[in-house]
Amino acid sequence: MELLRKVSGYLTFDNICTALSVIGAVYFVINRFILHRAPVPSSAFKHVPKDLLDECIKQLKKQEKRVYEDYELPIALRRDLQLRPDDEEVLKRLLCSICDHMGIDGSFIKLIISDTPVPERAGAISTDLAFTTIWLEMRPPYVTDSIIAVLAHEVMHLHLYYEGIRRQDNWENEILTDTAAVYCGFGDYMYKGYAVNQGEMALSYRKVGYIRQEDVKYILDTIGKQE
C-alpha cells in the first residue's frame, strides 16, 4: 500500500506529459537518425488490401484503350520547379505537361493554387465536361515529386471520367485513381511523391496520396509480371 501511494504521487499530469515527451523524442531520434526513416507508424495510413489493388489493375487492363509510356518531366520544367515551386505559371506548365502525356488538352483547365492548409487534402478537381478546375494545396517544404504526384492524381480523375472508368465506393475510386496514375506511366513520381516527408516543423511529417510507397511498388511489380 505504501508503494502504491509513492507511485501514485509521481503520476501527476505534468509527470505523465514529460514521460510521453521523452518517449516520443527517443522514438523520433531512433527512427530519424539511426533507422533513417520517417518516425510515423504505418498504422497512420489506411491499409489498402492487395485484393483491391489487383481488382483495380484488372479493371484498368480491361477498360483502358491506350498503352502509356513512362512519363518524363522535361528538364527545363524540372529546373523551374526547383527554383520556383509555388509559381502559378510553372505549375500550369506542369499540369499541361501531365495532361499532354494523357492526351488531354490542359490549356482549358483552371488551376487554383491555395496556401491555406486543408486537412486530409492535397488537391481536388471539379468538372462538368465543359469546364474543369483543379485545386492544388501548396505549403512548404515543397517537394517536386509530391507536386507531380498530386497533379497526376487529379488529372487521372479527369481521364477516368472521360473514359467512364470508376468504382462505386468513393474510397475505392480514389485507390483506382492512384493505381491508374501508376498504370499510365507516373509510377516513379508516385513512388517518390507518396513518401512521408518532413513538414514545416522539426517533428512534423506530411504524406499525400491514398496509397503507400509499398503499394506503388506492388502495382509496378504486378504490371511488370503481366506484360
Language-model segments: residues:
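Short, strongly hydrophobic alpha-helical membrane anchors
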Residues: M1-L11
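N-terminal signal-anchor transmembrane alpha helix of single-pass membrane proteins
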Residues: F13-H36
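Hydrophobic or amphipathic, alpha-helical segments that drive membrane association/targeting
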Residues: I30-L81
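Auxiliary, metal-adjacent structural segments of Zn-dependent hydrolase domains
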Residues: Q63-L129, P140-D145
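Hydrophobic (often cysteine-bearing) scaffold residues that line and stabilize catalytic clefts
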Residues: L91, I148, N173, T177
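Short pre-active-site segment immediately N-terminal to the catalytic Zn-binding motif
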Residues: W135-L151, W171-E172
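Active-site recognition of the HExxH zinc-binding catalytic motif
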Residues: A149-E163
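Metalloprotease/metallohydrolase-associated module, dominated by Zn2+-dependent proteases
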Residues: I165-E227
